[in-house]
From Swiss-Prot:
Keyword RNA-binding among UniProt keywords: yes
Cited function: Binds to the 23S rRNA.
Residues reported to bind Zn(2+): C6, C9, C32, C36
Note on how the cofactor is bound: Binds 1 zinc ion per subunit.
NCBIfam families: PRK14891.1-1
Keywords annotated in UniProt: Metal-binding, Ribonucleoprotein, Ribosomal protein, RNA-binding, rRNA-binding, Zinc, Zinc-finger
SUPFAM superfamilies, per database record: Glucocorticoid receptor-like (DNA-binding domain) (SSF57716)
GO BP term, example: translation
GO CC list: ribonucleoprotein complex; ribosome
InterPro entries attached to this UniProt entry: L24e/L24_sf (IPR038630), Ribosomal_eL24-rel_arc (IPR055345), Ribosomal_eL24-rel_N (IPR000988), TRASH_dom (IPR011017)
Coiled coil found in the keyword field: no
Protein name: Large ribosomal subunit protein eL24
Amino acid sequence: MEERRCSFCNTRITPGTGKLYAKKDGTVYYFCSSKCEKNMRLGRVSRKIKWARKGA
C-alpha cells in the first residue's frame, strides 16, 4: 500500500482511515482528521499552528 500523509499536518495516515478530498480542478488532499480538514478550509497555515508542526 502507498503511504499517505495528511495534507495539513503531514502525519502518516494508516490505511483504511482518514479522508480523501478531490477538488474539481484535480487537486487531491488527504486528511487524517476532520480537525485538519476544517483548518485547511478556513485557510489556516500549518506552519503557524503548534500542534500541526509536530507532525512535520
